[in-house]
């Protein structure tokens, strides 16, 4: 799974979201840090969301094994983006609003496309390190890969075989 870093606007917290299965996953403790709330508050909101039927636990929760600092393995529950957003609406914190805004644009684009581009930053580096040339080189490398090339040839062949010769 990929890790996506989300930094809160106040800069006080950096949350590591686990990207897997077209969504992201967090524990209750990570949600508490994200929304600047207590773990008990997050747990209560999740309990109410499940009891009210707003969320189905089988669809939004999965078990995961993690290794703690002491070397022991522990079972933890992870909650997907649907659960994270639902809790964020109930917590009603400024951080919840910020995260929902970010998740509905940047995160959604990453989960769908596999990448996100900061168009404004790429157009105007303003003294920051400029990675535009690196990005172009990576795109050239992807476009030149054999697999992509042969896929395009197969697409052209399929298209040409659709034409009637008469």
Predicted regions and their residues:
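Basic, low-complexity intrinsically disordered segments
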Residues: 1-166
């Amino acid at each position: 799974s990929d890790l996506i870093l989300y930094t809160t606007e106040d800069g006080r917290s950096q949350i590591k979201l686990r990207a897997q299965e077209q969504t992201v996953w967090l524990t209750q403790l990570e949600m508490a840090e994200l929304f600047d709330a207590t773990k008990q508050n997050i747990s209560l909101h999740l309990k109410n969301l499940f009891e009210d039927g707003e969320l189905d636990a089988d669809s939004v929760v999965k078990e995961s094994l993690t290794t703690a600092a002491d070397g022991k393995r522990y079972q933890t529950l992870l909650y997907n983006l649907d659960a994270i957003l639902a809790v964020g609406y109930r917590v009603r914190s400024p951080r919840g609003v910020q995260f929902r805004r970010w998740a509905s644009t940047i995160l959604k684009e990453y989960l769908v496309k596999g990448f996100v581009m900061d168009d404004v930053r790429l157009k105007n580096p303003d003294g920051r390190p400029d990675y535009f040339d690196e990005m172009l080189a990576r795109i050239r490398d992807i476009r030149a890969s054999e697999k992509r090339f042969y896929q395009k040839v197969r697409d052209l062949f399929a298209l040409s075989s659709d034409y009637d010769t008469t």
